[in-house]
Amino acid sequence: MGKYGDLMKVYKFGDIPVGVETRGVYFNDNCINYLAEKAKPEFVIKATDKDLEFEQMQSEDDQTYPKSYLEFIALYRKFCEKAIDYGVILVHGSVLEIDGKAYMFSAPSGTGKSTHAKLWRDCFGDRVTMINDDKPLIKFREDGIYAYGTP
């Protein structure tokens, strides 16, 4: 068992079932809508102390983050690195669905992606469903390109 007591659960992100070993409940609490307990994982990820240290060093400020948050970020980074092998990538953008089709607005931070998506929601009302407003997963398949929400 790890320092906080290992917890292994299966989640589905971008239609990929993945086993996730965690030290605590932060990841599990934030990903509860993605649980896929009966699915067989394609792979298993776990964050080490070294991974947590790396995430802390990557922060853009001098704040010290809780280990539970750093673990969340480290685990998600590991998933995204492996997801490429399954035709899934993480994109910085805002994705919405209208009339059965997804639309993504992608640009540098502060450009107005979320504002633009809000204008669509205001204009088209109930016809619009937000898929993800920051970092959607995009999956490339033979029958098309699919967008998925993320925790």
Feature-to-residue mapping (PLM):
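A noncatalytic interaction/capping subdomain that flanks phosphate/NTP-handling catalytic cores
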Residues: 1-109, 119-131, 137-151
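Conserved lysine of the Walker
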Residues: 113
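Hydrophobic positions on the alpha1 helix immediately C-terminal to the Walker A/P-loop
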Residues: 116
